[in-house]
Amino acid sequence: MLRYLLIPILYLQVVLGVLSEVLPSLKPSVVPKNTSLLSGRGVFRQLIDHTHPEVGTFSQKYWFNTTYWGGPGSPIIFYTPGQHPATNRLYYLTDTTLPGLIAKEVRGAVVLVEHRYFGESQPFDNLSTSNLQYLALDQVLADFVHFARTVELPFDLSGNSHPLRTPWIWVGNSYSATLVAWTERLFPNTFWAYYASGAAVNSMQDFWQFNYPTQQGMPQSCRSNLEAIISHVDNVFLSGSPEQKQELKIRFGLQDLSLLEDTAYALSQPIIGWTLIQPSDTHTQFSEMCNAIENANFSSSRRDFGSKTNFQTVLDNYADWFKTSYLPRLCERPNYSGWTGRNSVQCLDTVNLSSQAFHDLSVQNDDRVWDWIACNYFFFWQTGSPIDTPTIFSRLIDPVYYERRCRLIFPKEGNATYGIAAGVTDKSMNALTGGWNRTGKRILFTNGEFDPWRSASVSSVFRPDGPMQSTSQQPIILIKGVQHQADMYVRNRINKEVREAMDTGIAQISRWVLDFYTENSKTLAHDLQGFCVH
């Protein structure tokens, strides 16, 4: 009898010990002296196919930082860098970013796990269509759940960092925030709470709404001029003479592109730079573009109207800036033959089937992996707005443009193909994930007011019932005046709106952490009482 009682009694002592440490204050009483970037790294043997374990395993890499960790039973702050090799995103382990800041607040350890098929976490030695079959949404989400449930963390061999014994908090931004939201929906009951910054939750193949927040937030005279430029480009490419079309391509340095849609796409690309602007930035490529167009001096945050400029001058200014500042070295890639010229346009050419972009199956080709994700289950293709809506993205770019590229990059190999070719659509994805219709539990969403990704988020103005309302179990914070994932970086705390959002979010996560220990102490006490009676 004693040996059966010993385990629950010791477990209760551990949890109550953690409670006594955590409940009075979630902040460490003394800031640890160890401020090194990393505490260590590990290798996890991950299943290639979670429905067929016999397929085998691969080495999934992870890193951890225990600078603020309070010991066994203390929280785990979980993060994945999504579509980036982990070695390029290890700063997310530190308190210069939100995961590290939360860890500091709740005395947690940060654990960063690399996404399958990126960086060093490769199931196969090449990225053929057949090998990419295991890069599917269910496999990706199952990776992180399986990791949390079964990993033996090197810094806690006691086993008390299991999700049943300690709260695992998943923090994500951008694509990884979408994974956060979809995990909460499809794989609940492993992670205790979630923080999703800039999560696109409603799948869209024709994502023209991406443009809207940019149009609302950018300097309005720059917006008007860009709308006029894109309208002119579309008119020339749709109804101009062959000479006029070629002249326009030459003006922008894009004469080597044979497909008009590729040229239109290239001329629309600088607009996407709006997404990257952070409140702490003092100079951005986007503001540089607007300044060049109007010979003005806009800051990255200014949104007022400027003076009107003659359209021909505006067009010439944009062409000069594009050709001399944006295009040079855009496509330069030394390891690809033909891509070494300063003004190469090879990365923009989607019809040159001899291009190495179509044949590079090496596991270092992150662009191919991301293309697969987009073609398989993620979508969110930026397109031109409907004809009755002003656009800053060419209307020549529609879902067909992207789907054609999917077919060329990922030829069918036997029965192996990508999601869209197999019948996956945005509608089927939303039926699976819930899209805009969701009722979450202990998940916090944040979105920037002028973030293009807001249009697919819970705060979207395009949501049929309007932006989703915040609840106690699913708090939603709209950060005024900022773009994408601004609350992920401590340097952005210079912005009042970002600072308040971060403080509110961290306080909410802290309360949920306390809830875990409170609820689990009651459950353990009840279970132990029942066990002793019997």
UniProtKB/Swiss-Prot annotation:
Gene3D superfamilies referenced in this protein's UniProt entry, alphabetically: alpha/beta hydrolase
Annotated pathway: Mycotoxin biosynthesis
Keyword Protease: yes
Residues annotated as glycosylated: N34, N65, N126, N297, N335, N352, N415, N437
Active site, per annotation: S174 (charge relay system), D451 (charge relay system)
Keyword set includes Hydrolase: yes
Function: Serine protease, part of the gene cluster that mediates the biosynthesis of the secondary metabolite victorin, the molecular basis for Victoria blight of oats. Within the pathway, vicPa and vicPb are probably involved in the processing of the vicA1 and vicA2 precursors. The pathway starts with the processing of the precursor vicA1 by several endopeptidases including kexin proteases as well as the cluster-specific S28 family peptidases vicPa and vicPb to produce 7 identical copies of the hexapeptide Gly-Leu-Lys-Leu-Ala-Phe.
Family: Belongs to the peptidase S28 family.
Name used for this protein in its record: Serine protease vicPb
Organism expressing this protein natively: Bipolaris victoriae (strain FI3) (Victoria blight of oats agent)
